């Protein structure tokens, strides 16, 4: 599908651990235009998730969630052995307020994690028509390696300590529990 131009980019992630309450495989598809996304919708009518009948026989559940990419950034050097941390959230404020939260609270942290050399990239998505879904937004963190992921807690603490010097960032940090609810994080590897 990528070679036909219907899909601009795809990423296939597999959860590292067995978890009956979460997904085993996550496929992120980027469409180059709304028209191409509409073509995919037509494809899904005949082939759910784009899978043929033989593949569908192997699957017990499929869910499709249209998402909008709100923000993203990447380090100048790509990860050689990336590890993905998928963080689903439900936001409890208006979409505009949540987008401001992503811009003013999450983005400075993710930029710091990239600067510290542990994060290769991040993407922040908001679900379309998220009512009734298990989550309404997703933060996709691509760590450079397992070693980089192991430094996560220390790097988060270091970056947040720097950011707390900014009173506006600190105010958002202090009130973040009223903005979103974090769901179960999923550690995943990419199928290449």
Model-derived segments and their meaning:
Residues 1-49, 54-163, 172-192:
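Short S/T/G/P-rich N-terminal loop/turn motif that feeds into the first structured element of a domain
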């Amino acid at each position: 599908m990528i070679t036909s131009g219907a899909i601009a980019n795809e990423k296939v992630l597999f959860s590292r651990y067995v978890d009956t309450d979460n997904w085993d495989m996550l496929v992120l598809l980027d469409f180059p235009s709304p028209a191409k996304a509409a073509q995919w919708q037509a494809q899904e009518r005949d082939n759910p998730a784009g899978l043929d009948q033989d593949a569908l026989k192997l699957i017990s559940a499929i869910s499709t969630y249209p998402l909008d990419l709100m923000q993203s950034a990447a380090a100048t050097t790509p990860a050689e052995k990336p590890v993905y941390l998928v963080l689903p959230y439900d936001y409890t404020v208006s979409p505009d307020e949540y987008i401001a939260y992503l811009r003013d609270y999450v983005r400075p942290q993710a930029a710091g994690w990239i600067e510290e050399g542990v994060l290769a990239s991040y993407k922040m998505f908001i679900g379309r028509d998220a009512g009734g879904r298990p989550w309404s937004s997703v933060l996709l963190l691509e760590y450079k390696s397992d070693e980089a992921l192991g430094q996560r807690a220390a790097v988060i603490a270091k970056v947040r300590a720097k950011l707390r010097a900014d009173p506006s960032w600190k105010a958002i940090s202090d009130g973040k529990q009223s903005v979103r609810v974090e769901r179960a994080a999923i550690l995943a590897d990419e199928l290449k």
